[in-house]
Amino acid sequence: METMRAQRLQPGVGVGGRGTLRALRPGVTGAPTSAATPPVGPPPAPPPPAPPLPPLLLAGAPGLPLPPGAAGSPAVLREAVEAVVRSFAKHTQGYGRVNVVEALQEFWQMKQSRGADLKNGALVVYEMVPSNSPPYVCYVTLPGGSCFGSFQFCPTKAEARRSAAKIALMNSVFNEHPSRRITDEFIEKSVSEALASFNGNREEADNPNTGIGAFRFMLESNKGKSMLEFQELMTVFQLLHWNGSLKAMRERQCSRQEVLAHYSHRALDDDIRHQMALDWVSREQSVPGALSRELASTERELDEARLAGKELRFHKEKKDILMLAAGQLGNMHSSSC
């Protein structure tokens, strides 16, 4: 019974015969899938555009810790970031400049030393986008999984790294403010705003089988956590929604509560990414060009969010999954030649 339940909750979209364990296994087809074997039967169509999600379910949503108006103007954003960075003046080098890369790392090491639950340690990870000429772009991933990127025109790789560290440091600092914690008051305010936005009623908020009810359930399950911690969790659900996996789970008769309970305790890992990539391989084989169109759209969204100083993990994970799918397609084409 437990095995069947786990199979139904796998993130693969899955098509093919129903009522068997094989049909409920991860992947994009009812038959076993390998990199060199075309899928059997009609693959799933690309998911429709995602409808608006409740507040705090969007990457870079208002609940994330950016100063008021910071995302509205590049100049205001730069000023806000510099103000936070200057507060770390003890981390100076040369002519009074702040070593933001060092400051960001030290900030998270300090959090760990004070008892923060950092499952993968306090290491801050930087990733440069391959390029032979400016502007250079750098992403930084914080220990919890939140991702930020260089938000300015960066003529050097070192400047891109510093730019990414600045925006990550600002968000890390603001995230420590008490107003960034999920409290009973915050939950009531957020649910009321969601009800108003979607013309819902109070009964919906109390029913975990509705969208707003599920939103409330997620907030209450994460009471006491910060906005960044909550956003890291919601990235998994955003990806499941984007990929069409949530719809597939409903078709497998998974209740909303089952899905929430299962994925609230599952980190985003290579297994989830691989299964979603297989879904996009199947879509591309069914609708040639679907993958390249989605990738182009995702890259635009990622760049816009990066330049606005927003949290980027949802957009970046989408791009990584699509690039993984493109690589798998390339391997399949090479092996068939």
UniProtKB/Swiss-Prot annotation:
Gene Ontology process terms (BP): actin cytoskeleton organization; gene expression; mitral valve development
Pro residues compositional bias, start-end: 39-55
Compositional bias (Low complexity): 26-38
Location of region: Disordered: 1-55
GO cellular component terms attached to this protein's record: protein-containing complex
Cited InterPro entries: Autophagy-related_EPG5, LIX1
Family stated for the protein in its record: Belongs to the LIX1 family.
Protein known as: LIX1-like protein
Gene: Lix1l
